[in-house]
Amino acid sequence: MKIYTFGAENAPVILLLPGTCCHWKGNFGHVIPLLTESFRVLCVSYDGFDETETTEFPTMIEETEKIEAYIQENCGGHIRAAYGCSLGGSFVGLLAARRNIHMDYGILGSSDLDQASAFTAKLQTNLLLPMIYPLIRDGQFKSRFLQKQMEKRAAEMGDYVKAFMGMFGGARPYVTKQSCKNQFYSDLITPPPDKIDIPGTEIHIFYALKMGEKYRARYEQHFANPVIHEQDLQHEELLACYPEQWAALVKQIAEGNENEVQN
């Protein structure tokens, strides 16, 4: 695992955590410059997904431990905020609940927080991986049907599908199938605890309403008092398609400007 740093060393720290099988630049490369005016930005590049390393993703807990160790060693165990894109939101929940480091603000970006039994998780992973892994490795689906469906959706939905696919980071032949498998499976069997309530930590959730109503209940299940920002958008559409608005909202939250924060 690597953590890339940007901005002034004495600025408040914001930690960025990528989504499932995503490259850190694909997720956050376009917004990091918008944050470095105010923050020292730390961007995680997970084991198995960084082109400069020969590693494989282990488990959610092992990766969380590495993130905690870095924050303890380099930030005195305290950061201003953490933003998790999709899967990254699971890390935000785990980091908050484990209490080995402290964050003033934890922000989940459209995270689904899906969970399953070990048996079901293994089944889902084994079904999904043959479809998704070629996209990670080659930058496109192996199945002509899936590729055509994706192109059709892109034509129907405009910039969103193109921007969303770009968040994966293009073809990455160095990513192993085992890393993808470990990340899918481990995320499903490692849910955050229920009713997380940490003194001094505010949890904010970017709730993409077009994902469906069930996610509101899920957020309220796992967090005792989440601040839910309703957005009439698709999964991580704010980050993918509206970077200036995303950065403005993240900065308002992390700077504690509650009266300026708009849902």
How should these model regions be labeled?
Residues Q178-Q221:
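Conserved serine/cysteine hydrolase catalytic core
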Residues A97, Y105-I136:
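Flexible "cap/lid" loop of the alpha/beta hydrolase fold
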